[in-house]
C-alpha cells in the first residue's frame, strides 16, 4: 500500500514537473536558459556543417566544374550555330529585299518579260566593266539582251553559256548608249571612261543641259528599249570655244554593290552592222 | 603530278579571283591571283612544269574575261620568260625576285590590257589609267606577293621534293 502511494506520488511530482517546465517554456521564462545551452551547440554544429560542406565541395566540385564546362561548351556551340543562322537569315532577308524590289519593278512594266539572275563575279581585267551572272541560254538569255535593275539600266548581255552569261555594263569604256533628256527631249550618246565615269558626249551647245536633268534610254540604234532610267546629270562642261558640250552623268545604279539583275528577254536588239557602209577598197 | 594539280588549283583561283578578289578593288585596281601564282611557280628552282601552268592560267582568265584572248596569255608568257631568266641570276633572293616579277608582270599585263583597248578603238586617259588602275593594282599585287610566294613555294616543295643527303 505504501509502495503504491509512493509510486503515485512520484508520478504526480513528475507530471507536475513536466507540466511546469512546459508552462515555463511556453511562457518564455526558459528562453535565456535555452539560449545559453543551445548556442554553443549551434555554433559547433554550424562549424561542423561548414567543414563538411567544404570537404564535400572539395570532393564533388571538380565533377561539377567539368559538367559546367561541358555545358558551357554545348551552349557556346549553340550560340555559334544560332549566330550563323542569324547571319544566314539576314543574308536571305537582304537577298529577298533585292528580289522584292526587282519584282516590283517587273510588275510596274508588265509589257516586258524578265529573267532574274544573281551576280556571281566580275571581270578580271580592271580596265573593263563586265559582270558574270548565273543564268544563261538555258534560261532563254541571248546576246544583246538588255539588263536592268529596279533602279535603272545596267548593261546588256555580251556572251552566253548554258548556265551563265557575261554582261557589259554601261560603265564599260567600250559601251555606247543612246539617251535622251526627259525634260528637254535632247538626244545624245552616253559613253564611259575606263574608271566608269559616265558622260554625255557631243551634245550641241544649243541644247540646254542642267544639273539634275533625268537621263533615259532613247531606243535609237535598237540596242536598248526606250525609256529606261539611267541617272541624272551631275555636272556640265561647256566652254564658249567648243562646238559641243559634255555632261557628267551620275548613274542611279550602284554598280559596285550589284547583287541581282533582271534580263529583259522579249527585247530583240537590232544589229545595225550590215547597214553601216564599209569603205570601198 | 604538277600538271595534275594545276587544273584544280588554277580553276579554284580563277573562281576566287572573279567572285571575290575582283569585288575588292583599291580605287579601280584589283589584285591578280593567277599572275602571282604563275610568278611564284615560275621562280621556284625545282619546278619544271611551267608552261602548262601558264597556258592553263591564260586560257582560264581569257575564258571568263571579255578581254581579247591573246592579252592575258601573252602577258603571262612574257612574265614567265622573265621569271625563268631571273631565276637563274638572282635565285638566292627569291623574295626580291618575286617582287620584281610582280612589278614587271603587272605593268606588262596592264600594258597589254591598254593595248587591247586601244585596238578596239576605246579612247582613254593614260595618266588616269595609271593612277587609278595600274598603280593600285600594283600595290595590291605586291602586298599579296609574299604570302602567295610562301604558299606556292610550299606547294612546289611538296610536288618536287628535294633529294636527301646521306
Walk through the language-model features, giving the residues of each:
Chain B
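Terminal, non-globular segments
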Residues: 1-166
